[in-house]
């Protein structure tokens, strides 16, 4: 298959790398987590991608009727310097060569005017205040959100029109599964909050994150400053 996917299409099984493991079987990920929400975003060094990666980590426990994985157009070996198996609560698939992006016909845009929403501009503005410098003439991958069944069948697809046109957080993913009647039956109660998420390091051990030092959410200092060493070397990717 090649080209844009729609509900009813079927993704091929493939092997993928993460920053902490190589040649993982996509078949196994689906078997363990379907219905799987699979979100494709730009490279992991981009402030928008980093913002949503942090947001998904913070709200991960709000998604309890399916699984989630994030795909980024970055090299696994470079991300391995700051991302280990316990850094994120969800799998981070690395596709630096864009094999899946090309297979699924994910659009690219050159320059920010055609790819940035208002939220994306706000994220980029804050990132620049903290030292981020976007590459000149860089091509940006627009996002794609899929929900996949255990055999790789596409249950839902949405090609984003801007860099932030993805589920806002994991609670939004849960709501989408329920709206589409795809929620996996659960034997346990819905978690009340995210207070027990354990992916964060002590605040005095974690660096500040360039581009994510939000002035608008000072009550959430823990999250904004201790998403581990997640993004320490990413800007070079």
How would you describe each model-predicted region?
Residues 1-28:
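N-terminal "domain-start" segment that seeds a small globular fold
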Residues 26-56:
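Short active-site neighborhood of thiol/selenol oxidoreductases, capturing the structured segment around
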Residues 41, 72, 149:
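Short beta-strand/turn micro-motifs composed of small residues
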Residues 50-103:
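Structural microenvironment flanking redox-active thiols in thiol-disulfide oxidoreductases
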Residues 95-165:
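Thiol/selenol-based redox catalytic cores and closely related redox-interacting motifs
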Residues 163-179:
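A short, polar/charged loop-to-alpha-helix boundary motif
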């Amino acid at each position: 298959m090649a080209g844009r996917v729609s509900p009813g299409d079927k993704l091929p099984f493939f092997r993928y790398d993460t920053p902490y493991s190589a040649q993982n079987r996509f078949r196994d990920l689906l078997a363990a987590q379907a219905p799987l929400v699979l979100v494709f975003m730009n490279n992991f060094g981009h402030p928008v991608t980093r913002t949503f990666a942090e947001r998904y980590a913070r709200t991960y426990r709000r998604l309890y009727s399916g699984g989630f994985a994030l795909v980024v157009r970055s090299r696994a070996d470079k991300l391995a310097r700051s991302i280990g198996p316990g850094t994120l609560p969800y799998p981070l698939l690395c596709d630096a060569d864009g094999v899946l992006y090309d297979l699924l016909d994910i659009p690219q845009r050159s320059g920010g005017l055609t790819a940035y929403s208002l939220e994306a501009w706000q994220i980029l503005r804050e990132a620049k205040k903290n030292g981020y410098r976007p590459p000149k003439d860089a091509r940006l991958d627009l996002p794609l959100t899929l929900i996949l069944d255990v055999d790789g069948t596409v249950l839902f697809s949405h090609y984003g029109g801007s860099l932030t046109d993805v589920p806002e957080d994991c609670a939004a993913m849960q709501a989408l599964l329920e709206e589409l009647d795809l929620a996996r039956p659960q034997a346990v109660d819905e978690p009340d909050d995210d207070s027990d998420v354990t992916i964060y390091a002590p605040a005095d051990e974690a660096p500040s994150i360039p581009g994510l030092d939000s002035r608008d959410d000072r009550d959430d200092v823990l999250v904004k400053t201790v998403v581990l060493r997640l993004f320490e070397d990413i800007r070079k990717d």
